[in-house]
Design a protein with these regions (language model features):
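Active-site-adjacent loop and "lid" segments of alpha/beta metabolic enzymes
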Residues: 1-34, 49-132
Length: 132
């Protein structure tokens, strides 16, 4: 995330969001490993200091984060990326959430942070059946 929670959405700028976030996590995971911390989860921060275009780029390029050899968490549930793109409200974003969960799983996500547990479980079960 660039900036602070108070100003992170005010014109976020990245030359290449995926590369910059990956470089950040390479440095942080190395620092943690050197300090003896091995159990880490990578949360690339969808929606935090990023535009809709940044979020879609991160989702498309999610697999590059596998090089960190850590579980990848995505938190796309009801995010503004969905309702801004579809012109709906957060409360109406369940279908969009499920689509982004599926794309995330296909691109390497291991953990979903969700609001709608039943629907997310169904998504993961179908994904697992597809992968079998």
């Amino acid at each position: 995330m660039k900036g602070t929670p108070q100003n992170m959405q005010q014109n976020p700028q990245y030359e290449n969001v995926s590369k910059e976030v990956l470089d950040f996590f390479i440095e942080r995971t190395n620092t943690c490993s050197q300090a003896g911390i091995q159990d880490m989860i990578i949360d690339i921060g969808f929606g935090f200091g990023k535009t809709v275009a940044h979020n879609f780029q991160l989702l498309r390029e999610l697999s590059v984060f596998k090089m960190l050899h850590k579980p990848i968490l995505i938190g796309v549930s009801r995010k503004s990326t969905i309702y801004k793109t579809l012109g709906i409200t957060a409360e109406e974003a369940l279908n969009g959430t499920t689509v982004l969960h599926t794309i995330g799983l296909l691109n390497g996500a291991n953990i979903l942070r969700v609001h709608d547990v039943k629907e997310a479980v169904e998504c993961v079960r179908l994904f697992d059946a597809y992968q079998a």
